[in-house]
Curated annotation (Swiss-Prot):
PANTHER family for the chain: JACALIN-RELATED LECTIN 11-RELATED (PTHR47293:SF66), JACALIN-RELATED LECTIN 3 (PTHR47293)
Domain of life: Eukaryota
Protein keywords: Lectin, Repeat
Gene name linked to the record: JAL4
Domain Jacalin-type lectin per the UniProt entry, residue ranges: 2-148, 151-294, 307-448, 451-594, 601-744
Annotated organism of origin: Arabidopsis thaliana
InterPro entries: Jacalin-like_lectin_dom, Jacalin-like_lectin_dom_plant, Jacalin-like_lectin_dom_sf
Disulfide bonds: none
Keyword Repeat (UniProt): yes
PROSITE patterns for this protein: JACALIN_LECTIN (PS51752)
Record-stated family: Belongs to the jacalin lectin family.
Protein name as annotated: Jacalin-related lectin 4
UniProt-recorded Gene Ontology molecular function terms: carbohydrate binding
Length: 745
């Protein structure tokens, strides 16, 4: 939703308003005289569905007469106004001068600023899309409408050969840039991006030469300026990138990476930070471009939610002990057992990278001592199984399970009563309980478990790729296969109910696929083989096979070879791949994350107009926030923020938000929940069969305001005694239909 800054300057004049139904500003006209600014005029542009800009000429605000007239032009395809600076005469109530700043350049001061009072119009991270104010024979005051600013793309500089690559503008920032350099050019660039707190790596070119890097103090530091040179490399006769240098939001300047050449280029966008690269590369970096996005320094991260404490289970008696929950991982477990039961336990932890040795709980005695070690870099404790003697009040046996392995039963479980410590989707970071001469009972502290990364298996050649851990699950895996190897892998991921496809390798050979019944089925096991391919003399992935949470086993894709590998993480599902590929799949690795099958929910059919593509957010525990965006014809987009196991789960945009942005309806979750949705729809010319024009949400406590305009065709979504726990529907650049998932209250 657009933000309106009230008019600033002198008092008086007649009110005028260009409104905010534009997408950008194309040209500014300012006429000045001895008294001050005589008039302003703004020409706008509005983009149609094909992204073709339609000009909209503005009106004159003030009075045109003898004076100097200056213009300031803006390229609406890649440029936008970020701020206005002005001066006014308070006694006369007239603006004396104006200066306009875009993401790429700044105008001259138009008028004069001698002894005037200064004002400014600026909202961090937003662009001006319209103006308003007061004027008579002169301009008295000026205000503006702001909308979220789009990223700025700088075209690549350098040669036009080699392979085109583009990382896009969907990252939050850059954490590190690394290089391979020789005496004449940049052979390789490696970028570590931040995406919602996780690192995603990309690399382009050949890893040949000396290694250098520039590390950012992200998220408090960003790259705000990039300078480079390019020229012909004599031994190849190709125009390539020869040097790069960066400046940051903290005033730091990087070293010059490479050798400075004749042709200089600069990428800089006022008030913006570098969030992505694109270019061309093969044996070296032939060309490079960049994306910049308005810079808003991150607020301090909210504190993590408190650990969940499971009360001690086992026998009665003993003295209370507590290792507390202020650790990051459990690294080693010591258990001493005897004839009566477990004599003592001891846990070693790590906190902020530093080892912490725990205390003995129980009494050291004669007995067998066993240890169980956990690698904190990629392994975590997910559960404990135990047995106790109720009459003696003593724990008799313990078994520990991580995301990768399970210990033996330490002690004995004959005729004992069983207990377990486990919270789905979480890991153990601390223990507590009761003990005296023996261990009487045991409890644990749980926090959300991180994804598990399995390093890629196969060869070390070809192009590195990494899909990361930001997907919800895998819907389908497809392959191109020949007689010896896997030539290509294609993955259909689920992300907020939408499908995102990634593919790596060459699409050569026969086609095979494995479809998962997501979201009720996940891949929980992956097995493969790799070996040297004789005709290429390269170690590559030769076969892959999968098992699912429903007990299904896929066919073997490819030809089984000698070197076997297995990826499996207890209680976890496959959510992402990484590896290396070019003409074939050279190597593959995987990410697994703890999963909880969604509860059984009832689907209520989507209502509204016809048209659009289907989408589904899936089923959650509840709804936290609702965002509704409006356009010319009706509801342009919706977005929902859910609760999933006490964690915030943000859905995707369904439809296309306009520069008006979103209106928000925030629920007092978990005490408040949605019971019904009311809506209207209508057939609108150009909307392809009908669009939803209004939505209104009713909770167990209140009713939201209507978002949009009511029409004669309406609908209600809901079921008595049920609450809404997810949404689905159809959309294009607008919202056509909306349906819901409901569960009993």
């Amino acid at each position: 939703m657009a933000q309106k800054l009230e008019a600033k300057g002198g008092k008086g004049g007649n009110q005028w308003d260009d409104l905010l139904d534009h997408d950008n500003i194309a040209k500014i006209h300012v006429q000045g005289g001895h008294e001050g600014i005589q008039y302003v005029k703004f020409d706008y542009v509005k983009f149609d569905n094909l992204k073709i800009g339609q000009p909209k000429l503005g009106s004159i605000h003030g009075l045109s007469r003898k004076g100097f007239t200056q213009t300031f032009e803006i390229d609406p395809t890649s440029e936008y106004i970020v701020s206005v600076e002005g001066y006014y005469d308070e006694s006369k109530g007239i603006i004396q001068a104006l200066k306009f700043k875009t993401n790429k350049k700044t105008s001259d001061m138009i008028g004069y600023d001698e002894n005037g009072l200064k004002f400014s119009l600026e909202v961090k991270g937003k662009a001006i899309i319209g103006f308003h104010g007061f004027a008579d024979t002169n301009l008295n005051s000026l205000g503006a409408y702001f909308a979220p600013a789009p990223p700025t793309k700088f075209d690549y500089q350098g040669g036009s050969g080699a392979q085109l690559w583009d990382d896009g503008s969907n990252y939050n920032g850059v954490r590190k840039v690394s290089f391979s350099l020789d005496d004449t050019e940049i052979r390789q660039i490696r970028i570590e991006y931040d995406k919602s707190g996780l690192v995603e790596k990309r690399e382009y070119g050949s890893n040949v030469g000396r290694q250098e890097e520039f590390v950012l103090d992200y998220p408090t530091e960003y790259i705000i300026y990039m300078e480079g040179t390019c020229d012909i490399v004599s031994d190849t006769s190709k125009n390539r990138v020869r040097s790069l240098m960066f400046k940051t939001s903290k005033g730091r300047t990087s070293p010059i990476f490479g050798k400075v050449a004749a042709r200089k280029f600069v990428f800089e966008s006022n008030g913006s930070a570098l969030i992505g690269f694109h270019g061309r590369a093969a044996a070296a970096v032939d060309a490079i471009g960049a994306y910049f996005s308005p810079l808003i320094l991150s607020a301090p991260a909210p504190p993590p939610p408190p650990a969940e404490k499971l009360q001690a289970k086992g026998g009665n008696g003993g003295n209370q002990w507590d290792d507390l929950a202020d650790h990051d991982h459990v690294t080693k477990i010591y258990v001493q057992g005897g004839q009566e039961g477990i004599q003592y336990v001891k846990f070693d932890y790590v906190k902020n990278g530093q080892p912490q040795s725990g205390s003995v709980h129980g009494l050291l005695g004669r007995g067998f001592t066993q240890t169980f070690e956990i690698d904190p870099t990629n392994e975590h404790l997910v559960s404990v199984e135990g047995y106790y003697d109720e009459s003696k009040g003593l724990v008799q046996g313990l078994k520990f399970k991580t995301n990768k392995k399970t210990s033996d039963m330490i002690g004995y479980d004959e005729n004992g009563l069983k207990f377990s410590l486990e919270v789905n989707g979480k890991k153990i970071i601390g223990f507590h309980g009761y003990a005296q001469t023996y261990l009487n009972s045991l409890g644990a502290y749980f926090v959300t478990a991180p994804p598990t990364k399995f390093d890629y298996q196969g060869g070390s050649g070809a192009q590195l790729w990494d899909d990361g851990t930001n997907y919800n699950g895998v819907r389908k895996i497809s392959f191109a296969l020949d007689a010896n190897e896997i030539r290509q892998i294609r993955i259909d991921y689920d992300k907020g109910g939408l499908i995102e496809r990634r593919e790596y390798g060459g699409n050569v050979g026969r086609q095979e696929e494995f479809v998962v019944d997501y979201p009720s089925e996940y891949i929980i096991y992956m097995e493969g083989t790799c070996d040297i391919v004789s005709d290429a003399s390269k170690n590559r992935v030769r076969s892959l096979m999968f098992k699912t949470s429903k007990g299904r086993t896929s066919p073997i894709f490819g030809k089984v070879a000698a070197r076997k590998f297995v990826f499996e993480s207890n209680g976890s599902a496959l959510i992402g791949f990484h590896g290396r590929a070019a003409a074939a799949v050279d190597a593959i690795g995987a990410y697994f994350s703890r999963f909880i099958l969604p509860p059984s929910a009832e689907t209520l059919q989507a209502k509204g107009g016809e048209g659009g593509d289907p989408w589904s957010d899936g089923v959650f525990n509840g709804v936290r926030n609702i965002y509704v965006g409006q356009g010319e014809n009706g509801v342009s987009a919706v977005k929902f923020v859910y609760d999933k196991d006490s964690q915030v789960a943000e859905g995707n945009d369904h439809g296309k938000p306009t520069l008006l942005g979103y209106e928000e309806f925030k629920l007092e979750y978990p005490s408040e929940y949605i019971t019904t949705v009311e809506g209207c729809f209508d057939k609108i010319f150009g909307s392809g069969g009908g669009v939803i024009t209004m939505l209104k949400f009713k909770t167990n406590k209140r009713t939201s305001p209507p978002f949009g305009l009511e029409t004669t065709s309406n609908f209600v979504l809901g079921k008595e005694g049920y609450k809404i726990v997810g949404f689905h529907g159809t959309s294009s650049h607008e919202l056509h239909q909306l349906g819901v998932y409901v569960m009993p209250i």
